[in-house]
Amino acid sequence: MNQTLLSSFGTAFERVEHALDALREGRGVMVLDDEDRENEGDMIFAAETMTVEQMALTIRHGSGIVCLCLTEDRRKQLDLPMMVENNTSAYGTGFTVTIEAAEGVTTGVSAADRVTTVRAAIADGAKPSDLNRPGHVFPLRAQPGGVLTRGGHTEATIDLVTLAGFKPAGVLCELTNDDGTMARAPECIKFAQQHNMAIVTIEDLVAYRREHERKAS
């Protein structure tokens, strides 16, 4: 990642801390990966605190594929099969079958309905029958170990919301430009500033976690 673009947002560690503060305050975070990976920015929110207004913003400015990042334990609890047995996507993104709340939704596609689905999936004691399949929310299974195992937006989301003190569940969606193309770092940074989001890179988070684990050992 071009550090010149990020220098005004502090050091890598400061950017992670700002991201955690943003989540604790109920705000979103823009998570950037490297130019030689997906080269995109994802809007992420803690699943516990995401509002209908934030979901609407995500749908309006994102790819439309709103994803709910979950741990393997939660995936098993909800009995969500993986979308395919043999994942041949470039980065092995862990899509499960799509979901919809079994109660409290209409078509399932509105911002309010998608928030209802997210809340149903992360509720304490949630069970498979609380969700219908397919639906308009795309669960993603994070790899154990987070970004230290796989440097993806899914793992970054789980790591960030967990470090911020929330349940290990977060919502993400890729930012797109008005013409439908994928937003790159300059556009992502501008959008984040306009919408009071913190900005962090996956590289920042990897360094942060490694340093904290080194100090803990």
UniProtKB/Swiss-Prot annotation:
* The EC number(s) this enzyme carries: 4.1.99.12
Q: Name one GO biological process term.
A: riboflavin biosynthetic process
Query: Matching InterPro entries, A to Z?
Result: DHBP_synth_RibB-like_a/b_dom, DHBP_synthase_RibB
What does UniProt give as GO cellular component? cytosol
* Residues reported to bind Mg(2+) 2: E38, H153
User: What is the reaction catalyzed?
Assistant: D-ribulose 5-phosphate = (2S)-2-hydroxy-3-oxobutyl phosphate + formate + H(+)
- Site Essential for catalytic activity — annotated at H136, E174
Pfam families, alphabetized: DHBP_synthase
Identify the enzyme class. Answer: lyase
Q: Which cofactor does it need?
A: Mg(2+); Mn(2+)
MF annotations from Gene Ontology = 3,4-dihydroxy-2-butanone-4-phosphate synthase activity; magnesium ion binding; manganese ion binding
Metabolic or biological pathway: Cofactor biosynthesis; riboflavin biosynthesis; 2-hydroxy-3-oxobutyl phosphate from D-ribulose 5-phosphate: step 1/1
Annotated binding of D-ribulose 5-phosphate, by residue: R37, E38, D42, R150, G151, G152, H153, T154, E174
Q: Identify the residues that bind Mg(2+) 1.
A: E38
- Cofactor binding, note field: Binds 2 divalent metal cations per subunit. Magnesium or manganese.
Highest taxon of the source?
A: Bacteria
Q: How does it assemble?
A: Homodimer.
Family recorded in the similarity comment: Belongs to the DHBP synthase family.
Q: Report the protein's function.
A: Catalyzes the conversion of D-ribulose 5-phosphate to formate and 3,4-dihydroxy-2-butanone 4-phosphate.
Output this protein's name: 3,4-dihydroxy-2-butanone 4-phosphate synthase
Starting at the broadest rank, the lineage of the source organism is: Bacteria, Pseudomonadati, Pseudomonadota, Gammaproteobacteria, Enterobacterales
